[in-house]
Amino acid sequence: MTSDCSSTHCSPESCGTASGCAPASSCSVETACLPGTCATSRCQTPSFLSRSRGLTGCLLPCYFTGSCNSPCLVGNCAWCEDGVFTSNEKETMQFLNDRLASYLEKVRSLEETNAELESRIQEQCEQDIPMVCPDYQRYFNTIEDLQQKILCTKAENSRLAVQLDNCKLATDDFKSKYESELSLRQLLEADISSLHGILEELTLCKSDLEAHVESLKEDLLCLKKNHEEEVNLLREQLGDRLSVELDTAPTLDLNRVLDEMRCQCETVLANNRREAEEWLAVQTEELNQQQLSSAEQLQGCQMEILELKRTASALEIELQAQQSLTESLECTVAETEAQYSSQLAQIQCLIDNLENQLAEIRCDLERQNQEYQVLLDVKARLEGEINTYWGLLDSEDSRLSCSPCSTTCTSSNTCEPCSAYVICTVENCCL
């Protein structure tokens, strides 16, 4: 709303002092003119021309706001009778005119400032290059591939860890079996050692019995020899001189008895020897079989232990390879995260700058809104003053209604280079 109205021109051609009516007086009002040029593209009819004022006698001065709401005050024309306007009322109207002119000047300057700001904002918006978000899809694809590889590696590590645990459990089982077999072998070796001691004792007993039998045989031979010698000696002493026959029980055959005893002893010894040899052979065979089975089991356990050791070594090597691969992938992920973190920091900085600019724009908008509210308050206050002005005019209308003046008013609204104008002619204005 740009407006700068020219000064109000009141041109009284004549104001007589006779008792009759004075010559006609005209007041020309021009509104909605730019400063210095007096030309505008807007020609508006004053908003308050629709108000009908029934006046009898002299017509009051005309007020036209136009596009700039600038009233035309004919206060300097001496056409009123008996001092209708007092000095205080004239000063009040002059003060209101000054306030309205300053208000219109302020509105015009604010509109120019707003137009300048709008042009600057439009230029800035045209100069701003829209930020194009870079395409990070290939980086996202690379990250997804690396994440899939990491997940596969973790699954493989878990599987290898499970296999390693199973191998450790199998190794522990075989170790416990080996220890049990070793303890059983030691027990069998202890039994064999004890059986060897028993066999040696039996062999010693056998040799003792054989020596005892030999000594008994020698004693028997000595007894037989002594008996024969004694019998022969007695026979030689007696000779044929004495023949004594005794009716006694038959004598025992000592040789037969000794032979029987020897046979019994030899039979017992043979049975004992055979039983001992058979028992020893059975025990030895069992021990040999147990030893062979234990040796086979021990060899199998040793082979399994060697195989498990080789498997554990291979798994350890594979685990180290997987760990190195995992470390390299983690380093790659860390580098990627650092790169994207730096890019994200740059984007965040850009976002912060844009947010700061947006905050500044919002502050400017709030400030302009506050200024607009202040202007609205000023407008409301000025409207109140204008209403007061109208009240004063109405009071003057009521006071002038009794004046014996006849007034004619001709108005003309035309759209010309200098804007709308209205000509008021006051005729027969009496002093």
Curated annotation (Swiss-Prot):
Gene Ontology process terms (BP): epithelial cell differentiation; intermediate filament organization
Protein name: Keratin, type I cytoskeletal 40
Domain IF rod: from-to ranges: 89-400
Coil 2: annotated segments: 253-396
Positions of region (Coil 1A): 90-124
Further details from the record: There are two types of cytoskeletal and microfibrillar keratin, I (acidic) and II (neutral to basic) (40-55 and 56-70 kDa, respectively).
Tissues in which the protein is found: Expressed in skin and scalp. Also very weakly expressed in tongue, breast, colon and small intestine. In the hair follicle, it is specifically present in the upper hair cuticle. Not present in the upper cortex (at protein level).
Quaternary state and interactors: Heterotetramer of two type I and two type II keratins.
The entry's keywords: Coiled coil, Intermediate filament, Keratin
Protein's organism: Homo sapiens
InterPro entries linked to this entry: IF_rod_dom, Keratin_I
Signal peptide boundaries: none
Spans annotated as Tail: 397-431
Record region (Linker 12): 237-252
Lineage, opening ranks: Eukaryota, Metazoa, Chordata, Craniata, Vertebrata
Residue numbers spanned by region Head: 1-89
